[in-house]
C-alpha cells in the first residue's frame, strides 16, 4: 500500500513546495527588486501618508475636484473588496434610468451642453477604473476652475500634463488618472496665494 502511496505523497509535497513557496517567493522577490512601487500596489503618498492607489478609482463629488467614472462595485460603489460591474444589460430599464440620472447630474453640476463622454456616465467592468478620458476631463475644467478660482487655461494645462498617451503609440486610449490630477490641483492651490482651495 505505502509502496503505491509514497510516489504520490512525494509528488504532492514537491509540488506544494515549488508552487506554494519557491515560485511565489521568486516572483515576489523579482517584483520587489525590479518594480517595487507596482509590486506594492502603486500606492500614492501625500505628506508621508498613503492617500490611495493609482490603480483604484475613488469617489470625488465636490465641485473643486475632477470626478472619475461611476462605480457599481459594492452597495455604494468604489468598494475595492467588491470589484465588479452591475451586470445589467443594455435593455435593462434600471440601467437606462441610472445612466439618465448621471447625465442629468453632469449637466446640472457642470453646466454641460452637448455630448457627454460615455465614461463619465457609465461604470466599468471592474467598477474601480482610476482613469477617465481626456474628453471627460476637459468637460469638467470649467467647473473645477470656477470652484478653485483658477484660470481655465491653467486647469486645462494641468489636465494635459497628466494625460497619459497610448502605450507604444497604438495600444489603448489616452487617459487621465483622476487621483493624480486632483492631488496636483491641491498642490497648485497650496502654492498659489490668490487661490481658494475648497475642502
Swiss-Prot record:
One Gene Ontology molecular-function label: ATP binding
One Gene Ontology term, aspect cellular component: plasma membrane
Keyword Chaperone: no
Localization per Swiss-Prot or TrEMBL: Cell inner membrane
Membrane topology: Single-pass membrane protein
Domain of life: Bacteria
Keywords: ATP-binding, Cell inner membrane, Cell membrane, Ion transport, Membrane, Nucleotide-binding, Potassium, Potassium transport, Transmembrane, Transmembrane helix, Transport
Keyword set includes Metal-binding: no
InterPro entries, per database record: KdpC
Record text on subunit structure and interactions: The system is composed of three essential subunits: KdpA, KdpB and KdpC.
Known function: Part of the high-affinity ATP-driven potassium transport (or Kdp) system, which catalyzes the hydrolysis of ATP coupled with the electrogenic transport of potassium into the cytoplasm. This subunit acts as a catalytic chaperone that increases the ATP-binding affinity of the ATP-hydrolyzing subunit KdpB by the formation of a transient KdpB/KdpC/ATP ternary complex.
Protein name: Potassium-transporting ATPase KdpC subunit
Record organism: Gemmatimonas aurantiaca (strain DSM 14586 / JCM 11422 / NBRC 100505 / T-27)
Amino acid at each position: 500500500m505505502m509502496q503505491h502511496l509514497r510516489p504520490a505523497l512525494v509528488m504532492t509535497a514537491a509540488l506544494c513546495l515549488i508552487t506554494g513557496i519557491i515560485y511565489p517567493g521568486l516572483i515576489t522577490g523579482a517584483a520587489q527588486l525590479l518594480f517595487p512601487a507596482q509590486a506594492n500596489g502603486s500606492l500614492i503618498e501625500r505628506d508621508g501618508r498613503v492617500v490611495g492607489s493609482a490603480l483604484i478609482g475613488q469617489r470625488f463629488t465636490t465641485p473643486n475636484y475632477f470626478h472619475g467614472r461611476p462605480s457599481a462595485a459594492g452597495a455604494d460603489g468604489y468598494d475595492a473588496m467588491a470589484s465588479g460591474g452591475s451586470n445589467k444589460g443594455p435593455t435593462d430599464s434600471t440601467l437606462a434610468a441610472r445612466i439618465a440620472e448621471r447625465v442629468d447630474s453632469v449637466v446640472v453640476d457642470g453646466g454641460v451642453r452637448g455630448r457627454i463622454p460615455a465614461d463619465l456616465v457609465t461604470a466599468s467592468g471592474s467598477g474601480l477604473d482610476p482613469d477617465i478620458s481626456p474628453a471627460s476631463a476637459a468637460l469638467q475644467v470649467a467647473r473645477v476652475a470656477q470652484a478653485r478660482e483658477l484660470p481655465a487655461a491653467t486647469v486645462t494645462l494641468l489636465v494635459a500634463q497628466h494625460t497619459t498617451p497610448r502605450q507604444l503609440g497604438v495600444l489603448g486610449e489616452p487617459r487621465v488618472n483622476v487621483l493624480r490630477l486632483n492631488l496636483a490641483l491641491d498642490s497648485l492651490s497650496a502654492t498659489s496665494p490668490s487661490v481658494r482651495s475648497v475642502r
